[in-house]
Design a protein with these regions (language model features):
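Cytosolic-side transmembrane-helix boundaries in multi-pass membrane proteins
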Residues: 1-33, 186, 206-209, 213-220, ...
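Short loop segments and helix-boundary regions at transmembrane helix junctions
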Residues: 6-15, 75-78, 98, 113-158, ...
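Transmembrane helix-bundle core of multi-pass membrane transporters
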Residues: 12, 42, 128, 132-195, ...
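Loop-to-transmembrane alpha-helix initiation sites
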Residues: 16-17, 103, 132-134, 173-181, ...
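Single transmembrane alpha-helix segments in multi-pass membrane proteins
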Residues: 31-32, 48-99, 123-130, 264-278, ...
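Inter-helical junctions in multi-pass inner-membrane proteins, predominant
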Residues: 37-54, 147-150, 192-198, 226-263
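Helix-loop-helix "hairpin" substructures at the membrane interface of multi-pass membrane proteins
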Residues: 102-110, 116-121, 125, 172-248
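Transmembrane alpha-helical segments in multi-pass inner-membrane proteins
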Residues: 233, 244, 248-310
Length: 340
């Protein structure tokens, strides 16, 4: 018992983000034991290649989802529809491209899909007071049907050099999706940390009634977080569809909302709302993709990914449990009193 209390106290004294960074390092080191030259990176045809670069590239769509999900969860909400929004945006992009629309019109159409989906979720939660998990579940279910209606139940393929570059090209030696994700993260950080928006979001998550009494337009704040989440989900859908040069309404973004939620929770944002850190959420996505890659490199079946993720969710939620935290505080006080 005393060893557990000392370990807990030691972890709490570490700088913020140390636990996530340590977890990522451990995952990568374990991967290096099962894969030869895991840390090797080489430049070929103006682009970096290697297992580490592959992890960055593969986690880009989930990282985009986690940016929006972080803001939504910080308000005390949740967005289960991001995977379906990815499917709708990918289907919209493919349809508009095949119909001969210009790229600016295609991108405007895709972003419009993200905004509309975000507004739908936001209004259901903030205006009609529907529980976030129920409100977003509606679009999660209906969204795939909408995507299938757009594609008429088929996988639509297209061929466009610019879109191909967005999905599988390179920019400044790194995969284009990685660069886009970093730019999105930087813009989000500026938006929430260099303006009052971040403080308003945290205030709503901590105590929405107190925030409203303080003069904060709480419905507008909640709706804005869902709109941002919808936009990032739409961009993620573009990347996934552009990567395979096609729109698969059935599988695009399937269950990625769970990875995004897990990444945010691993990053330290409580599902009850409140303080958040987008950079730690991105670390969470790297940890998840590192685990996925390690399982594949080890030769285990991909289904083990879901088992491991479920175990991680259980551990993280237990660590955030108010009952467990209260028990730790009580035993710490009792221990200090005993020593005195």
């Amino acid at each position: 018992m005393e060893v557990f209390m000392q370990t807990t106290s030691w972890f709490q004294r570490l700088p913020k983000g140390s636990a996530q960074l340590l977890a990522l390092i451990v995952v990568l080191l374990v991967n290096s034991l099962v894969a030869h030259n895991f840390f090797a990176i080489h430049l070929q045809d103006g682009r970096l290649f290697g297992s580490l670069i592959d992890i960055l590239n593969r986690c880009a769509p989930v990282a985009l989802l986690s940016l929006g999900m972080t803001l939504v969860i910080a308000t005390g909400g949740i967005d289960l529809s991001v995977g379906a929004v990815m499917a709708i945006s990918g289907a919209t992009m493919a349809h508009l491209t095949i119909e001969g629309y210009s790229l600016p019109m295609v991108f405007l159409g895709v972003l419009g899909v993200g905004v509309l989906c975000g507004l739908w979720n936001g209004f259901l939660v903030a205006i009609f007071k529907i529980q976030p998990i129920v409100a977003t579940l509606i679009l999660m279910v209906a969204g795939r049907g909408i995507a299938q209606l757009i594609t008429q139940g088929q996988i639509i393929t297209f061929n466009n050099d610019v879109l191909a570059w967005l999905g599988s090209g390179a920019c400044l030696w790194f995969p284009t999706p990685v660069v886009l994700t970093l730019l999105a993260a930087l813009l989000t950080w500026i938006l929430v940390r260099k303006t009052a928006l971040g403080l308003f979001i945290e205030s709503v998550g901590i105590n929405i009634r107190a925030a409203k009494n303080a003069g904060i337009n709480t419905p507008a704040i909640v709706i804005s977080t869902y709109v941002v989440s919808g936009i990032f989900a739409a961009i993620a859908g573009v990347i996934v569809a552009a990567d395979i040069r096609g729109a698969d309404a059935n599988n695009a973004g399937l269950w990625l909302e769970m990875d995004a939620i897990l990444a945010v929770v691993i990053g330290g944002t409580s599902l009850m709302g409140g303080r958040f850190n987008i950079w730690l959420s991105l670390l969470g996505t790297l940890i998840i993709q590192g685990v996925n890659t390690g399982i594949l490199l080890s030769g285990y079946q991909p289904e083990w990914n879901q088992v491991v993720k479920a175990m991680v969710v259980l551990v993280v939620l237990m660590m955030q449990s108010p009952a467990l935290l209260r028990w730790i505080r009580q035993h710490r006080v009792a221990g200090e009193t005993h020593h005195v």
